[in-house]
C-alpha cells in the first residue's frame, strides 16, 4: 500500500492510497504532529515507505495506516493524553514492571482484560484522591 494524499481533521491524520481507499489514525500516536502548527504539518515529503516531516523530525509509515490498532484503547488514550504522568512511578505504584506498562501504552503488548481493568481502576482511585482535595 502506498499513501498518495494526506490531510488532518480534528485529532486524526487521514491518508488516501493509490486505489482511492481512505484510512485514518489517531494523532495521539504522533506527539510531535499532534502539537505541530498547521504550517508545520503541511511541510512533509513522501518517501519510499512513508511520510516525513523534517522540521519536526516525525515519520509515519504507509503501513501504519492499515494497522488494526490505529485507534488507541481506553488505557492507551489516557496515558498518551497525559504525558505528565511518570509511567515508571505509576507502574511501581501498582506493582508492575515499568517496561511492561510502556509496552501496553505503546501497543507492543496487549494486557489481559483483568490487567487492563486493574490499571484503569488504579487511575480512577487516584482521580478520586485528587477530587477529595477540591
Where do the language-model regions lie?
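Motif-centric detector for short Cys/His coordination patterns
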Residues: 1-134
Amino acid at each position: 500500500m502506498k499513501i498518495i494524499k494526506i490531510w488532518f481533521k480534528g485529532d486524526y491524520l487521514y491518508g488516501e492510497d493509490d486505489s482511492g481507499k481512505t484510512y485514518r489514525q489517531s494523532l495521539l500516536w504522533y506527539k510531535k504532529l499532534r502539537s505541530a502548527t498547521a504550517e508545520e504539518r503541511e511541510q512533509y515529503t513522501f518517501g519510499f515507505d512513508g511520510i516525513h516531516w523534517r522540521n519536526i523530525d516525525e515519520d509515519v509509515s504507509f503501513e501504519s495506516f492499515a494497522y488494526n490498532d490505529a485507534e488507541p484503547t481506553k488505557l492507551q488514550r489516557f496515558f498518551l493524553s497525559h504525558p505528565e504522568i511518570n509511567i515508571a512511578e505509576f507502574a511501581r505504584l501498582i506493582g508492575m514492571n515499568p517496561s511492561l506498562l510502556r509496552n501496553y501504552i505503546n501497543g507492543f503488548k496487549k494486557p489481559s482484560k483483568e490487567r487492563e481493568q486493574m490499571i484503569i481502576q488504579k487511575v480512577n482511585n487516584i482521580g478520586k484522591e485528587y477530587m477529595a482535595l477540591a
